[in-house]
Amino acid sequence: MQTALLKPKIIAVEPLGDHHAKVVMEPFERGYGHTLGNALRRVLLSSMVGYAPTEVTIAGVVHEYSTIDGVQEDVVNLLLNLKGVVFKLHNRDEVTVSLRKDGEGVVTAADIELPHDVEIINPNHVIAHLSAGGKLDMQIKVEQGRGYVPGNVRKFGDESGKVIGRIVLDASFSPVRRVSYAVESARVEQRTDLDKLVMNIETDGVISPEEAIRQSARILVDQLSVFAALEGTESAAEAASSRTPQIDPILLRPVDDLELTVRSANCLKAENIYYIGDLIQRTENELLKTPNLGRKSLNEIKEVLASRGLTLGMKLENWPPAGLEK
């Protein structure tokens, strides 16, 4: 009797427009279409990393209920329009950008002054309309985040929230705008009781629908891995014999396996950081004190570690293990 579960062998991606696609996966055992479709949908909507404006300072404006001479929109509508700008940051977690425009005309996202490692996905997005003599001068803080974070959460958790004129925004970081799924019938040879999973995904352009699916699947696999390693209750003798913490094999690999730039790799070796286990125990401040290792290299290291589920500043017991060569 066949007991092995089927795995999907056909994955098709059908573009439906800019940043919009239909992803079809089949065949699944009966019931798995809904099981996986619902899980992927929830992760896509709640757990994708993205970027959003979080704070704004506008010249001459004290609070969000103000108006600006020469600007058609009041500050509330101005901020709503600003939230529609889609930012993408490269090699950094936050940035402050400027928007300065005067004279009659339309203010769009393309008018925002950007550093070389920041881009705007929708430069034609309208932010405001200026009349003759109108002027707009703004400082916009953009941050990386996950999910939805209300402005009052950051405002009251941050003493700098008391600065007059600083407007803290509700931030929706998710790059996924809409997700839906449907389960249809599939057939393999004589079996007609199988599932076909059809997912309809629209993003804001920071990531593609295909990449969104990949990232959500990795998150699910990572979260479920703890259950795959689940063991029963140990006896007292077994518990005593297993008190020595087991070291994750990835920590024993050399930092060269991270495929960092030559500059970053050389800086780490100069500080006697030869293994990934050595690296994750260092803090950001410690690494920034390393000669020739700047913020750009630090961000590169953080991104590479994050892709493997690791961070800086982790604590390891019994490190280095006996016999580890330097």
From Swiss-Prot:
It catalyses: RNA(n) + a ribonucleoside 5'-triphosphate = RNA(n+1) + diphosphate. Coiled coil: none annotated. Residues 1-231 are annotated as: Alpha N-terminal domain (alpha-NTD). It is an enzyme of class 2 (transferase). Residues 247-326 are annotated as: Alpha C-terminal domain (alpha-CTD). GO terms for cellular component: cytoplasm; DNA-directed RNA polymerase complex. One of its GO terms (molecular function) is DNA binding. InterPro entries: DNA-dir_RNA_pol_insert, DNA-dir_RNA_pol_RpoA/D/Rpb3, DNA-dir_RpoA, RBP11-like, RNAP_asu_C, RNApol_insert_sf. Keywords: DNA-directed RNA polymerase, Nucleotidyltransferase, Transcription, Transferase. Its EC number is 2.7.7.6. Signal peptide: none annotated. It comes from the Bacteria. One of its GO terms (biological process) is DNA-templated transcription. Pfam families: RNA_pol_A_bac, RNA_pol_A_CTD, RNA_pol_L. Homodimer. The RNAP catalytic core consists of 2 alpha, 1 beta, 1 beta' and 1 omega subunit. When a sigma factor is associated with the core the holoenzyme is formed, which can initiate transcription. DNA-dependent RNA polymerase catalyzes the transcription of DNA into RNA using the four ribonucleoside triphosphates as substrates. The N-terminal domain is essential for RNAP assembly and basal transcription, whereas the C-terminal domain is involved in interaction with transcriptional regulators and with upstream promoter elements. Belongs to the RNA polymerase alpha chain family. This is DNA-directed RNA polymerase subunit alpha. It comes from Cupriavidus necator (strain ATCC 17699 / DSM 428 / KCTC 22496 / NCIMB 10442 / H16 / Stanier 337).
